[in-house]
């Protein structure tokens, strides 16, 4: 076991990978922001030296923030949120800390478990069965932060996600909690300070180091008691804290009530690509076994289920927030069949929408679906990449029965049609506008 967090990070980082997420020479599993977050927590420093450096409000470089002590003395456990591939949690565990970690993406959680094996912290096993001593994965809810005195966080891309996380910390952590949240400077904005300041009286920004920077938050504002409990991203009833999540909006064009947790793509709205696919969804086959792959808030799944009440629709996404959002959206529109991490087969289960967490279609049987709906993502974390869609096309081809169809909307400049032809089968264009194309591919 490493004697310090820094030593563990330096030893582990070169051996860590992103798999099963997209891998490439320009995409890394651990970077300077991970290192800075760990160093800024002060866990390796003697207690007498644990104090905040002079810092400046992000976006206001002339404002001087006085020094203040951190809360890292005698810390035995650390809460980690947004760890991408284990670069935060694993060094902490190696240095002897107990770590509670929440990772929204299933690919990131699996990568962290595999990386624990690679660096010698865990024994090889089926990926979801790998046990990492000292590390416990947890849903994003009040229990994750209950009594916490130190929270480390990779800043999320979405301000909504940051708002939801900050609210839960402020309402459930120890009043003396300190939050150290970091990222690459190019992905940070002054609005992140504002999101934290809604819930914490003290928010500061350290000087940038290696193109990375950390924000610090402390002194939670007074707790606000909710008027009613709402489902949290885990699907369980939320304790006070997620006071404004999920957010709900009514979309006039579709007639849908859309529910969204903070990290859900497009929030409680409908992105323009999905809206184009919705405009021609009535031309899709009348199918009994349907999958909305990469479902987000479940708009496609719910729309199809409303038009086809006897259909069994699986809404699948690797994001915890997306699955919780899709479940809430299905319930709000009266078409929910169930939810959870163990999906029904499209061949069984009740009619309606079942939202499940899965990496692509890994849990689905070969030749089991009649119709798959897909709006493929092109972001892996903060990175823009076209490498995600081909894997989804291949998985869709495996899961579709002969004669089944993949209806896909994609940015026209990406020119996915040849890949769809090669992976799935004969592909025809359904509609195209200046930005997006909708195609149907027959298996």
What positions do the PLM features span?
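Conserved SAM/SAH-binding loop
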Residues: 139-143, 356-362, 435
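Helix-to-beta-strand junctions that scaffold the AdoMet/dcAdoMet cofactor pocket
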Residues: 173-174, 400-402
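Conserved SAM/SAH cofactor-binding pocket of Class I
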Residues: 35-47, 73-124, 271-374
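N-terminal auxiliary segments of SAM/dcSAM-dependent transferases
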Residues: 2-6, 23, 154-251
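SAM-dependent Rossmann-like transferase core, predominantly class I methyltransferases
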Residues: 27-31, 36-40, 210-289
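Conserved proline-anchored active-site loop of SAM-dependent methyltransferases
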Residues: 150-160, 293-301, 369-382, 396
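C-terminal catalytic and target-recognition region of SAM-dependent MTase-like enzymes
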Residues: 406-443
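Class I SAM-dependent methyltransferase Rossmann-like catalytic core
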Residues: 2-44, 262-267
């Amino acid at each position: 076991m490493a004697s310090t967090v820094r030593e563990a990070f330096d030893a582990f980082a070169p051996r860590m990978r992103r798999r099963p997420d997209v891998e490439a020479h320009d995409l890394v599993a651990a970077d300077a922001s991970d290192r800075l977050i760990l160093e800024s927590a002060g866990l390796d420093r003697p207690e007498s030296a644990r104090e905040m450096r002079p810092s400046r409000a992000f976006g206001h470089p002339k404002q001087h923030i006085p020094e203040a002590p951190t809360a890292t003395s005698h810390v035995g456990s650390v809460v980690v949120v947004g760890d991408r591939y284990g670069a935060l949690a694993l060094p902490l565990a190696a240095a002897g800390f107990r770590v509670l970690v929440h990772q929204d993406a299933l690919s990131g959680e699996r990568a962290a478990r595999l990386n624990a094996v690679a660096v010698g912290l865990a024994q090889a096993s089926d990926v979801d069965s790998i046990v990492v001593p000292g590390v416990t994965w947890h849903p994003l809810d009040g229990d994750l932060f209950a009594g916490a005195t130190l929270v480390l966080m990779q800043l999320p891309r979405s301000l909504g996600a940051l708002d939801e996380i900050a609210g839960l910390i402020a309402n459930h952590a120890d009043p003396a909690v300190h939050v150290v949240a970091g990222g690459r400077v190019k992905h940070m904005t002054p609005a992140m300070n504002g999101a934290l300041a809604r819930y914490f009286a003290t928010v500061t920004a350290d000087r940038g180091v290696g193109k990375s920077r950390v924000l610090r938050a402390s002194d939670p504002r007074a707790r606000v008691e909710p008027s009613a409990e709402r489902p949290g991203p885990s699907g369980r009833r939320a304790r006070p804290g997620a006071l404004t999540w999920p957010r709900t909006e009514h979309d006039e064009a579709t007639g849908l009530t859309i529910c969204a947790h903070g990290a859900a793509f497009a929030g409680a709205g409908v992105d323009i690509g999905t809206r184009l696919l919705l405009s021609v969804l009535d031309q899709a086959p009348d199918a009994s076994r349907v999958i909305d792959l990469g479902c987000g808030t479940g708009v496609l799944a719910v729309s199809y289920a409303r038009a086809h009440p006897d259909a069994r629709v699986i809404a699948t996404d690797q994001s915890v927030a997306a699955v919780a959002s899709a479940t809430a959206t299905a319930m709000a529109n009266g078409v929910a069949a169930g939810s959870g991490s163990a999906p029904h087969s499209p061949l069984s289960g009740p009619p309606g929408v079942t939202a499940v967490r899965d990496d692509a279609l890994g849990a689905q049987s070969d030749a089991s679906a009649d119709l798959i709906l897909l709006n493929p993502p092109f972001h892996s974390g903060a990175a823009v990449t076209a490498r995600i869609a081909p894997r989804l096309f291949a998985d869709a081809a495996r899961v579709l029965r002969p004669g089944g169809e993949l209806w896909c909307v994609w940015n026209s400049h990406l020119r996915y049609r040849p890949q769809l032809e090669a992976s799935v089968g004969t592909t025809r264009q359904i509609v195209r506008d200046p930005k997006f194309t909708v195609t149907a591919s027959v298996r």
